[in-house]
Amino acid sequence: MKKIKVKAYAKINLSLDVLGKRKDGYHEISTVMQSIDLADILEFEKSEIVKVFCSGHRVPEGEDNLIVKVINFLKEKYQIEEGVLVRLDKKIPLAAGLAGGSADAAATIVALDKLWNLNMSADEKKEIALKVGADVPFCLEGGTKLAKGIGEIFEDLNVPHMNLLLVKPDIEIFTKKIYDKWDRLNFKSHHATCSVVQAIQEGNIYKIAENIKNDLELVTSRECEVINQIKEELLKKGALGCAMSGSGPTVYGIFDDLQKLIKAYKNLEGIYSFVFFSKTIDKGLELYE
């Protein structure tokens, strides 16, 4: 096999409870993570050198790019001498709370396992994923999961189909900065995850929408006041409920009326830098050999 293509899907958080800071610097969380049909497309081809080409949204360079980080890690761990060319069609915005970098990292782990015949077990892939970033293990599997720890301990959930509208203001938010402010401001968690899980188990999108909450909104909305404005606009335009994803600044609304969603999309797409009509899906990656 000389070439492989992977679709790497974004995620949103239907809840995010921040429960405290651990000794290793990470934060203990309880969250419901959900894959959505917004995706980057990556093509991997055997080569003598390592090179990443990107179209679409700009991406970091060097080890700040999680694709490069995974490549270098695997080359060292498995003593791989050959390189790889990666062509990235970047559709998931950077620093948006949608795990775009983590999705690309997960895609790289799976693609290079096949391209370089590494024959990694599922546990080995997850172990490598966790070393790269807290959201990467989820992105390997995707779907709907209750995640605990730093986001690596999973329980599968079965969410009903939901149509979503994503809105991102023209600002980038960096996760570490938001968690650092959470610690300094000494906020307390909403503990929304239990209610969201119960609503999912009942298959009730109205209860899901009513209970979605993200603790980090308390911090990010201070940095980016337009987040509250976006939420108000989505609710006025027919969203059943809305919340910020990850550390932000992307906000999503859950809709049960497709016509209202389409109208909201048309009204907002000229105002904000990124507006995307999306839906929930049951996978994190899709491979094309």
Curated annotation (Swiss-Prot):
Gene Ontology MF term list? 4-(cytidine 5'-diphospho)-2-C-methyl-D-erythritol kinase activity; ATP binding
Identify the gene encoding this protein: ispE
Gene3D superfamilies membership: 3.30.230.10, GHMP kinase, C-terminal domain (3.30.70.890)
- Official protein name in the record: 4-diphosphocytidyl-2-C-methyl-D-erythritol kinase
The family database entries (InterPro entries) matched by this protein are listed as: GHMP_kinase_C_dom, GHMP_kinase_C_sf, GHMP_kinase_N_dom, IspE, Ribosomal_Su5_D2-typ_SF, Ribsml_uS5_D2-typ_fold_subgr
Q: Which residues form the active site?
A: 11, 135
Enzyme nomenclature, EC number: 2.7.1.148
User: Which positions in this protein are listed as binding ATP?
Assistant: 93-103
Report the pathway entry: Isoprenoid biosynthesis; isopentenyl diphosphate biosynthesis via DXP pathway; isopentenyl diphosphate from 1-deoxy-D-xylulose 5-phosphate: step 3/6
**Catalytic reaction(s) noted:** 4-CDP-2-C-methyl-D-erythritol + ATP = 4-CDP-2-C-methyl-D-erythritol 2-phosphate + ADP + H(+)
Keyword Amino-acid biosynthesis carried by entry: no
Instruction: List the NCBIfam families.
Output: ispE (TIGR00154), PRK14608.1 (NF011202)
**What does the UniProt record say this protein does?**
Catalyzes the phosphorylation of the position 2 hydroxy group of 4-diphosphocytidyl-2C-methyl-D-erythritol.
Member of which family?
A: Belongs to the GHMP kinase family. IspE subfamily.
What does the UniProt keyword field contain? Answer: ATP-binding, Isoprene biosynthesis, Kinase, Nucleotide-binding, Transferase
Question: Which GO annotations describe the biological process of this protein?
Answer: isopentenyl diphosphate biosynthetic process, methylerythritol 4-phosphate pathway; terpenoid biosynthetic process
Please give the organism: Thermoanaerobacter sp. (strain X514)
